[in-house]
Amino acid sequence: MTPEWSPLFGTATWDSMTESERVRLTRSEVAQFLGVGIWLEVGLQVALLRASHSADPARSDVKFLFNECADENLHSLMFVNVIDSIGSHFYRRDRSLDFFGWLFRTIAWDEVAYGIVLAGEEIFDVMQRDWMASEDVAAPIRRACYIHVVEESRHMAYARQKIRTRLIKISRVRRFISTLIIAMGTHLVAKSLINRRMYEDLGLDWKVVGPEIDANEHHRIMFRRAAEPFIEFLSREGLLNFGARWIYRKSNLL
């Protein structure tokens, strides 16, 4: 990734690192970010395929879903191969995120499932547009980001339309509940991008870098920038009430 997207950029720890240490750090952070993206996309596929398991496979919407899943699986394979090519690896997630993933796959309904995944897609889209344009980023990452940005634009448009369509038919109570659950899910996704195990694997003291990340205003600014398109969409569609705003602020996304 570009150095500016590292949660540690501008901190005392960052300033004390050599260039090779910064490269190793940002490559590990890319692996963490993309690992969360893969986990999120697989969860959505499981939820949608379960809902369509008994449907007529010749239906146009089911065929479209098959195409979407095929694309997402190719993206996941691409990211796995890219992370391997730069000498990094994926890191184990926190157990709370795995529990949330189980809930997401099992009970998330349409606008909630698409809303949480759209949050991740929108945030990664902003990040990857920077990464693919920077000479500071490893060539395999730049190529993968370019492919993903181009192909994912159709998926994001589809997710937005699915959310809009569902919102037409739902009650005020369901809209209120969905708004809060989307916010809570997005909060967990955003927080999962910071993985204690990854920093400790690099030999960094979490008791030092954890507070540095929490206090890093540059990191908060970059995350808010990444979330801007998603927050604007929520505002337009009436999915941004007082409670949701509070959660997004806690996530450094608003």
Segment roles from a protein language model:
Residues 1-254:
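Non-heme di-metal
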